[in-house]
Amino acid sequence: MDIYDIIDNIYKLPLASKEALLNETPEVTYPKGFHLFLANRKSSKFYLMKKGMLHAYIYKSDKKVTFWFGKEGDAIFPLQTLYNNQAGYENIELLEDSVLYELSVDKLHDLYLADIHIANWGRKFAERECIKSEQLFISRQFKTSLERYQDLIADYPDILQRVPLGIISSYLGISQVSLSRIRAKIR
């Protein structure tokens, strides 16, 4: 996905503001298995994903519990770092070889102060993430595992080809056996 499209999907910026943001955002590549962020460490980076797939997870009872997937067009960063200048609680691992656009969190904050359009872009992004978090919370609290699976497939149509079933079942909060039953039921 092109960086212009990624930026505009969040909030359309005037060309001068977009160029100011792009001047600070080089393209980087990392291999499958690379961790963009590690739990309990403060990070100085903010990423926009051009190509690839990743998951965010925490450890609970020595098991990885996935709570979010990222794909092309998504912004990736620990909320605690970006908004509270604290270490994040999550690990974010690439599930495929990936191409990203990398931006320093300090530089992003400087751009927020220097350009009202970029500040509004950041605000719109934060609003969008709050809505996503609320939807995820409601899904986890009130939807069945079948409904959560259907939502996941609607949001990530190619996820079964890109993500191991163990990670998908972790995200859904079910066993791989239960995931297999759900998949068999809706085929």
Model-predicted regions and their roles:
Residues 31-32, 50-51, 71, 96:
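A cytosolic small-molecule/anion-sensing beta-strand core signal
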Residues 26, 35, 53-58, 75, ...:
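Short beta-strand segments in beta-sandwich/barrel cores
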Residues 1-26, 81:
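Cyclic nucleotide-binding regulatory module and flanking cytosolic helices
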Residues 65-124:
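Cyclic-nucleotide recognition modules
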Residues 143-187:
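Phosphate-/nucleic-acid-contacting segments
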Residues 36-41:
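Short phosphate-coordinating micro-motif centered on Lys-Gly-acidic
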Residues 44, 48-55, 72-73:
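Glycine- and acidic-residue-biased ligand/ion/polar-headgroup-sensing regions
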